[in-house]
Design a protein with these regions (language model features):
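N-terminal secretory signal peptides that target proteins for export/translocation
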Residues: 1-8
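Phosphate-group recognition and catalysis centered on beta-loop-alpha active-site segments
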Residues: 15, 22, 26-356
Length: 356
C-alpha cells in the first residue's frame, strides 16, 4: 500500500451521483460459526465489518512495516510479525502476497527483490534460499486460525490478504492476475478461513476476478492519491513515464503503467472510485494518507464527506497508514471504521471491542 503523491485534485462529492448508486452490496447479518471441537463461537470477517465501535486497529504487515532497518522488531510480513501483532492485541492483521514460479504464494510486499529479480521467476525454495524469513500464505493463515479458534465469543484472528497488482517490470504481458487470485482462493479455502479473510487490492480487476472465483470472501478496494491525478500530473509528481494501456479487464476505467513499478487505474473522481467499488461488490473501500491528507488540506471536510458517501452506500471505510498518534487521530476524525497501524500503538488507541 503505498504510493505517495504531493498533491491531489480538489474533491467535490456529487451526492446525487453517489446516492444514486445501487445498494447491491447490502450488509447481511453475521453468520454464527461454531468450532467443531468445542462448540464455541468463532468470529468472522462479517463480525469485524458489523462492529459499531470505531476505529479498529489493523496490524499493518504484522506489527508494522520493517524490512530489517529496525532490529528491535520482526521483519514485516513474517510469521513472527503476524504472531506478535495478534499477541499484542490486534484483532485484525494484514499481509501482502506474491506468486512464485511454482505456483506458491509467498508473503512479501513487492513482486521483485532489491536487485529487481521478479519473485514469479523463482520457486519458493529459491526465494527462501535468498530470504529465509519469507513464509507461505498458508503459514500465516495457520497463525490467524490459531488465534481465531482459541478466542471464545470475541473477535480475533481476522486476516486481510492484499492481492498486489503486478508491476510492468515483472508481468509485462499482464497475465498473472488470475493465477494469483486462484492461488489465494485455494489457500484460504484449504485453511478453512474463508469467513475470516478479506481480500484487499488497489486493482479492481483483481477484485473482480476474486468476486467471480470466491464470492464468499469479502473484498476491499483501495485508492491512493496518485490515482486521482491525470497522466501528466502523475509524471510530474513521480518523474516516471506514464503509458496508457488497453486493459483486458478495464471495468470502464483508464489504466496506465507508471514506469516499471505500477499498473493501476485512474479515477476521474471519487464518485467513479465508489462506483467501481460497488461494481466489484466490495464491502470496504480504503483510503491512503496521500489521498485523504491532501484532500482535507485543499478542501476541508472532503475527507469526512468521502467517508459519509461510502457509508451511505453500505460500505465500510479503512485508512492507511497510521505510524503515529497524530496519524491515528487524523483518520479517526474523519469517521473511518478501521486504520492500518503499527502495533501496539493502534491497539492502545482503539476503543474497547465488545464481545460477540
Amino acid at each position: 500500500m503505498k504510493t505517495r503523491a504531493s498533491k491531489i485534485k480538489p474533491l467535490s462529492l456529487i451526492w446525487l451521483v453517489v446516492l444514486g448508486l445501487s445498494l447491491c452490496c447490502s450488509i447481511s447479518a453475521a453468520v454464527e460459526e461454531r468450532d467443531e471441537d468445542n462448540g464455541k463461537r468463532r468470529s468472522t470477517a462479517e463480525d469485524f465489518l458489523q462492529l459499531k465501535v470505531r476505529p479498529i486497529a489493523i496490524g499493518h504487515h504484522g506489527v508494522g512495516p520493517n524490512t530489517g532497518e529496525n532490529p528491535a522488531l520482526p521483519i514485516e510480513n513474517t510469521v513472527e510479525s503476524v504472531r506478535q501483532a495478534y499477541s499484542l492485541g490486534a484483532r485484525v492483521v494484514e499481509v501482502d502476497v506474491q506468486l512464485t514460479q511454482d505456483g506458491r504464494l509467498a508473503v512479501f510486499h513487492d513482486d521483485y527483490l532489491s536487485d529487481f529479480t521478479c519473485i514469479h521467476t523463482l520457486t519458493l525454495d529459491q526465494l527462501q534460499q535468498r530470504l529465509p524469513f519469507v513464509p507461505e500464505l498458508h503459514q500465516v493463515l495457520a497463525v490467524a486460525r490459531h488465534f481465531n479458534r482459541k478466542a471464545i465469543d470475541e473477535l480475533d484472528g481476522i486476516l486481510i490478504v492484499e492481492l498486489k497488482a503486478s508491476s510492468p517490470h515483472c508481468d509485462p504481458t499482464d497475465e498473472l492476475e488470475q493465477p494469483v487470485v486462484s492461488a489465494a482462493v485455494r489457500e484460504v479455502r484449504q485453511s478453512e478461513m474463508a469467513d475470516q479473510v478479506i481480500f484487499d487490492s488497489f486493482s479492481p480487476a483483481l477484485l473482480f476476478l476474486a468476486a467471480q472465483t470466491a464470492p464468499e470472501i469479502a473484498r476491499e478496494l483501495d485508492i491512493s492519491g496518485l490515482q486521482l491525478l491525470t497522466p501528466e500530473q502523475v509524471h510530474a509528481v513521480t518523474g516516471l513515464p506514464v503509458i496508457v494501456i488497453n486493459k483486458k479487464i478495464s471495468l470502464g476505467l483508464t489504466w496506465a503503467e507508471i514506469g516499471p513499478v505500477f499498473r493501476l487505474p485512474g479515477y476521474a473522481s471519487v464518485q467513479q472510485f465508489l462506483a467501481t467499488g460497488m461494481a466489484t461488490s466490495v464491502r470496504v473501500v480504503g483510503g491512503e494518507m496521500d489521498f485523504l491528507g491532501p484532500a482535507e488540506q485543499q478542501q476541508p471536510g472532503s475527507g469526512t464527506a468521502f467517508v459519509e458517501a461510502a457509508h451511505s452506500l453500505g460500505l465500510r471505510v479503512f485508512a492507511d497508514p497510521a505510524n503515529s498518534e497524530a496519524d491515528w487521530n487524523f483518520f479517526s476524525s474523519l469517521g473511518v471504521d478501521a486504520i492500518y497501524s503499527v502495533i501496539p500503538l493502534g491497539v492502545q488507541l482503539q476503543p474497547v471491542i465488545p464481545d460477540l
